[in-house]
Amino acid sequence: MARYIGPKLKLSRREGTDLFLKSGVRAIDSKCKIDTVPGQHGARKARLSDYGVQLREKQKVRRIYGVLEKQFRNYYRDAARQKGNTGENLLQLLEGRLDNVVYRMGFGATRAESRQLVSHKAIMVNGRVVNIPSFQVSPEDVICVREKAKKQARIKASLEVAGQREKPTWVEVDAAKMEGAFKRLPERSDLSADINEQLIVELYSK
């Protein structure tokens, strides 16, 4: 399945919630018709079956983190093999992706932009260039922008935008140095309450 490159707002409208795919600090406002699905006339949303609700939740989380279907299924399998709550394990694996950590630290305005920074070799982990967006970051890893990439206007702009967002407690960032540390894996209480990971577990458990 190819990665979606169309209008980001369509994905948020499809899921009926702001997926934070745009770079602004403000949530999507009413003029974007978040309560109607994409289409010429904004078709009315049909009542979903239990399976439909579970599928939509999976699609929502997959789109938030920008992960393809096969990748997402593999993350679920890895989460199920770990000890503890499978749903929480899944979210921690997604949060530990390098592109997501770069986004959380504010080096990229969106996860898509952060993925591009990683792919273009603008990011280092513990002093080494890593260009794999799915690379799993471990607690105490140090993430920084490469010296030659620090002049990029988009990174400076992203840090300014990030300064207006609520800062994640599981990362520490020195904006002046464009460097940060992944202090720990986020706990469930740290993450969005708008995600119901149990629905995803129920979907894949069938």
UniProtKB/Swiss-Prot annotation:
Annotated InterPro entries: Ribosomal_uS4, Ribosomal_uS4_bac-type, Ribosomal_uS4_CS, Ribosomal_uS4_N, S4_RNA-bd, S4_RNA-bd_sf
Cystine residue pairs: none
GO biological process terms, semicolon-separated: ribosomal small subunit biogenesis; translation
Keywords: Ribonucleoprotein, Ribosomal protein, RNA-binding, rRNA-binding
One GO CC annotation: small ribosomal subunit
All copies of domain S4 RNA-binding, residue ranges: 96-156
SMART domains for this protein: Ribosomal_S4 (SM01390), S4 (SM00363)
Gene Ontology molecular function: rRNA binding; structural constituent of ribosome
Subunit composition and interactions: Part of the 30S ribosomal subunit. Contacts protein S5. The interaction surface between S4 and S5 is involved in control of translational fidelity.
Job of this protein: One of the primary rRNA binding proteins, it binds directly to 16S rRNA where it nucleates assembly of the body of the 30S subunit. With S5 and S12 plays an important role in translational accuracy.
Listed HAMAP family: Ribosomal_uS4_B
The family this protein is said to belong to: Belongs to the universal ribosomal protein uS4 family.
Name this polypeptide is given: Small ribosomal subunit protein uS4
Annotated organism of origin: Aeromonas hydrophila subsp. hydrophila (strain ATCC 7966 / DSM 30187 / BCRC 13018 / CCUG 14551 / JCM 1027 / KCTC 2358 / NCIMB 9240 / NCTC 8049)
Gene behind this protein: rpsD
